[in-house]
Amino acid sequence: MLTHLDSQGRAHMVDVTDKATTFREATAEARVRMLPATLQMIVAGEHPKGDVFAVARIAGIQAAKKTSDLIPLCHPLMLTGVKVELSAEGDDCVHITARCKLSGQTGVEMEALTAASVAALTIYDMCKAVDRGMVIEQVRLLEKLGGKSGHYKLEEQA
């Protein structure tokens, strides 16, 4: 059942007034594939625009806080924690992990996904002058804790 549709099929914001306030946490990831030379430039701190990881981290945190402004029908949330981590993976990839937390009436999956996505977009923006062939991939929810639907953890396919 799609909870964002009413009985006539019209979109509406889900009413969470009567839902219990519980601890909720979500973790999402994204990857940015690039030329090895681009990744080396980022890791060595030689990018002319500055510290790519630091800017992408701040962009991801800001994006989590602005999710309800970007995603229609998403509730504005009082996040109590947002952590965005970036690391080199192999010789041609940046791995991004975003974790959001709160005590509230609705989940934080969209905030974690938005944080990871915007961090990836920021890397693309900062590096596009040297590598227009970058690919943003594997934007996905890794884990969700709390709420009525309980615990979800991505199971890797063998």
From Swiss-Prot:
Subunit record text: Homohexamer; trimer of dimers.
GO biological process, one term: Mo-molybdopterin cofactor biosynthetic process
Annotated positions binding substrate: L73, C74, H75, M110, E111
Organism field: Ectopseudomonas mendocina (strain ymp) (Pseudomonas mendocina)
Keyword Lyase (UniProt): yes
Name listed for the protein in its UniProt record: Cyclic pyranopterin monophosphate synthase
MF term (GO), any: cyclic pyranopterin monophosphate synthase activity
EC number: 4.6.1.17
Key words of the record: Lyase, Molybdenum cofactor biosynthesis
Gene designation per UniProt: moaC
Family designation: Belongs to the MoaC family.
PANTHER family referenced in this protein's UniProt entry, alphabetically: CYCLIC PYRANOPTERIN MONOPHOSPHATE SYNTHASE, MOLYBDOPTERIN COFACTOR SYNTHESIS PROTEIN A
Catalytic activity: (8S)-3',8-cyclo-7,8-dihydroguanosine 5'-triphosphate = cyclic pyranopterin phosphate + diphosphate
Pathway in which this enzyme or protein is active: Cofactor biosynthesis; molybdopterin biosynthesis
Enzyme class, spelled out: lyase
Keyword hit for Acetylation: no
Active-site residue list: D125
Family annotation (Pfam families): MoaC
Function, as annotated: Catalyzes the conversion of (8S)-3',8-cyclo-7,8-dihydroguanosine 5'-triphosphate to cyclic pyranopterin monophosphate (cPMP).
Gene3D superfamilies (UniProt xref): Molybdopterin cofactor biosynthesis C (MoaC) domain (3.30.70.640)
